[in-house]
Amino acid sequence: MLRKIRMILAGVFFVLITLLFLDFTGTLHHWLSWLAKIQFLPAVMALNVVVVVALLLLTLVFGRIYCSIICPLGVFQDVLARFRRKKNKYSYSKKVKWLRYPVLAVFIIAAVAGIGSLFQLLAPYSAYGRIATMIFQPVWKFGNNVLAEIAERADSYAFYSVDTWMRSLPVFIIAAVTLVVLFVLAWRGGRTYCNTICPVGTILSFFARFSWLKIYFDEDNCKNCSMCSKNCKAACIDYKNHKVDYSRCVVCGNCIDSCKFGALKYSSRASKSRESSEASPVDTSKRSFLLASAMVAGAAMAQKKEKLMDGGLAELEDKVAPARQTPLTPPGSLSFQHFAQHCTGCQLCVSECPNEVLRPSSDLMHLMLPVMSYEHGHCRPECTRCSEVCPAGAIMTVDKEEKSSIQIGHAIWIKKNCVPITDEVECGNCARHCPAGAIEMVPLDENDEESPMIPAINEAACIGCGACEYVCPSRPFSAIYVEGHEVHKKI
């Protein structure tokens, strides 16, 4: 019963949070963004005391069910482990302290020292976010585009095509390597990653030792058949000595389900004898129901591209991102420092951005940190999706009115790239598309009536949305680009 309830809850959580990363329509984040905000590390970074305390209390009562049900990377390992069809494939192994605790120490040092790349690399939720965003979402979009093409031939527009492109090759490689490592570890040893590398698993293991409900042996009923140990994906059951390493147990229920002699119980205390066990039988179904109720209640509480516009003025070739002195971060991130200190690199904002403005940074100093660039779209003033889904408080929630008054950067004009000068043609795309009215066209030479019109930028009114940079027909470098601000301003 415990195993079935765990599998149902884990399946629901995993499917929903995966859909949250895959969704490019903007419809699911209103309903599912709370799933990201109940993840342990994002809640810590957001100083969400309610969620952190709730998860710790959940661990103190039920054990490490966070790792077994809520964490998408943990459930994903269970999915990968199923590719190894061999039954009774696990065995007991001692905890790997020499690796487990040093990894946690490095993780904490990276968090305190602000070494974002290392912190994001080890964070479990962020690791799954990278895999979902960099690998799963492009495949999902490709499938959608195939359906859109088929539907269009049938005069149906139930689907629409979306662009797929490589947001960051280094981050894609990191995601692919992570996926391969997870597959090998899960295929060979189940939850090896959770109990040797994952810092969240190590933190929760300290509390799981003292959980109220645990897996206990009834030594009178145990036949030492080893089936429990062979089905324990955490490799934490020493059947010979009738002991369970509760710091590694993820309360999956596999051991109870595989035991034919009723020698394992999920209860608040160990059975002392056969007589006491028979006199007071342990009703695991009630505890399983309690577990399910707690998870459902906790979930309920947590919930309270346009085409290139070249105008025929330039060849259709890909734009090259300018070398910005200060990276652009989304409105609501307050400053680059605040964003870098709080971001866990889960890439949820990247996957949710409807205009594909956000992408993981390829800069070694800020690798995997989402930054903005305008080769594929601009940041629409009315869109606040990234601030709504950010689980770590790196992007504070802003409404449409507030966003329109936040200056994340300002536009800079590059004379040598501007087509009215280089090609002697009229343009004005940047001025026509500026939502803030911060650009007007003025003659290059006021004394010449035939002088080409060039953009004049009012930096005080510019909000840094990038509409001008995106629609600029100059290739490969735009004649106008947005330079970021270290600290965002209100205008």
What is each of the regions a protein language model found here?
Residues 1-242, 247-248, 253-491:
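Non-ligating segments of multi-cofactor redox enzymes
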